[in-house]
UniProtKB/Swiss-Prot annotation:
This is Phospholipase C. Zn(2+) 3 binds at residues 84, 96, 154, 158. GO terms for cellular component: extracellular region. The gene is plc. Residues 29-278 form the Zn-dependent PLC domain. One of its GO terms (molecular function) is zinc ion binding. Gene3D superfamilies: P1 Nuclease, PLAT/LH2 domain. Binds 3 Ca(2+) ions per subunit. It comes from Clostridium perfringens. The keyword Transmembrane does not apply.
Amino acid sequence: MKRKIYKLLICATIATSLWAVRTTKVYAWDGKADGTGTHAMIATQGVTILENDLSSNEPEVIRNNLEILKQNMHDLQLGSTYPDYDKNAYDLYQDHFWDPDTDNNFTKDSKWYLSYSIPDTAESQIRKFSALARYEWKRGNYKQATFYLGEAMHYFGDADTPYHAANVTAVDSPGHVKFETFAEDRKDQYKINTTGSKTNDAFYSNILTNEDFNSWSKEFARSFAKTAKDLYYSHANMSCSWDEWDYAAKVALANSQKGTSGYIYRFLHDVSDGKDSSANKNVNELVAYITTGGEKYAGTDDYMYFGIKTKDGQTQEWTMDNPGNDFMTGSQDTYTFKLKDKNLKIDDIQNMWIRKSKYTEFGDDYKPANIKVIANGNVVLNKDINEWISGNSTYNIK
């Protein structure tokens, strides 16, 4: 929002120092806007690996869904590179980082970063886009679902990049860009076509043991990110030799491809078995994914809130206020809300709403297009709004 210009001024020095690097390659594995590059290679090989590893006893529905995914391969590739070009993204790619030991991105762990911390991490983005992908797939929107899955795999690839898992930015070390360019130039040498296991062997079968997607996803990503972080200190920093960089890139990219095949395998099973992992489980947090309308003046500078009321009459409301500008025309903004009641289940929530409060005496109107609410790895509410909200107003979404 424009009212947050003072926040941007705090960021100005940091943004200026990174700008020259950003215009080259600040992000993790390379990716082009046309769906090519290292990220796209990882996503493509993830599908190839799974196809090669598929055991003969996999259910027909899994095979059919894999075929649908293959038919939408270009959307997977486009999604796998899109986060580096998303106009809604944070300027410094803060949410592309995740230290598996601290659970933070560099905005909380780096001493030089003095601005507002960003709550989103590469790990949380994996879970968000996976939830959106499963939701759209189950509705038959395979093209959009595959694009979202590609976005999720982009962030998995980021979490599996040595510099990103160690929270070492291009400000911290020139090796960040150099190493990832090194890997991009040699990516075809690092392709793998199998994990060495069939889907009825331990690597794949273990992927299905935890029905709680959020819990499984976090620990699955953590196992790969820990290896990537160790690689930074042992083989990928600026003190290491070219041979050591070659080893680091080979291991990290092989793991990225292997892990991607695992995520896709889990995705295919989740969309095929029809189970709802959010049902009858305690909800610790809600994630709101809000799209602002694309027409002129649809955005707002006013204060925005999200609230819930439970069946026993308890209410909780949160401010929706990301660092930088949000609720801008055409923007897609994500907010995570921690629930005070740790024993709450999604069915215990009776009402949800968004509320607008005027920033100035006059305020301005706001036109949200859509809001999706995610709980326990599933989209539990999808509301098309497309209405103007004026003044101090509350709009009930449930």
